[in-house]
């Protein structure tokens, strides 16, 4: 596997409204573990669409991993131009920082937002251009990643395409591990 697409919930879907929420570090730790293992097995590129939440936290994790594995690259393919338009200023600044550090940035449709069809095109692009999908997603709590997860599963039924998941139970295990380590 050379290219993995990463996605997951938006912050509000997780009840997270600030990047310093303790849940963010837990999610980043889970992402770090998965991505580091993939890098050690030959992963070269991580691709995200730049949406707030899991995707931008993934970018931060990639930047951390690049210290030890500088050949790992991050690409941000936005579904449309100026997707950050209308975001709060601190979220725009955070997003612009991530874009400034990414190895590749492009827009899939090369137009500003016109219709939900652009999200469908984004999902198709990600599944076509990647070897696997990693999603912070639990089918017990459907949310915005549902459609790309379904597309990945369909591709996996007909080709060698893998979907990997970080479930709520995985995050709970990390929380319990942290509590155990802090109690010692």
From Swiss-Prot:
It comes from the Bacteria. Coiled coil: none annotated. Pfam families: YpsA. Belongs to the UPF0398 family. This is UPF0398 protein BCAH820_1652. It comes from Bacillus cereus (strain AH820).
